[in-house]
Amino acid sequence: DEAYNNICMRLWDRLLQAALPTWNVIREYAQEDGAEGAALRAQGADAIVIMGGEDVHPAHYGASQGYNHEGRHWYRADLGQLALVDYAARTGTPLLGICRGMQIINTAFGGTLEQDIADGTHTNRAILSDHRFVRHGVRVEAGSHLERALAPVLVDSEITISSAHHQRVARLGDTLRVSAYAPDGT
């Protein structure tokens, strides 16, 4: 979808603008490169960031298609991003998942997703047409890496973020722990 791709490109542009001059930022198109190509391109990376996108294919977390508000699935992209998570876990490379990226990390570690959450705290079903994310607070867990990284901007262990999720973690993946959550538990 062109509108959605435009949103993703704006996010990418902001990430690149924020990059330090010493960073070597490589865009990985997991849909094109698949599992083998994604893992090869990650070799030598200092860190990996997996951005947002369409729904993770339910086959990766033991569920079925046909759920409410089902988005498009990019199975090959899923495989590429799952390979990036595997690479990061094997090599100790720092890994950050944003939106769908967090969901990919969770499924890579055996977790599951709630396929469609009710409208509310952080759902905007019109994101592809109005390009508006929902602003809401999240509570950051004490003692987490995230708390240490965000310490200068946290107010009473909270920060305001933007999101537009319609899915969330149902069962947390093995060895993962929650670093932050929205008021509804997401």
Regions found by a protein language model. Name each.
Residues M102:
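The feature captures the ABC ATPase H-loop/switch
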Residues D1-L96, N106-T107, G111-E114, A118-T160, ...:
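N-terminal beta1-alpha1 cap of cysteine-dependent amidohydrolase-like domains
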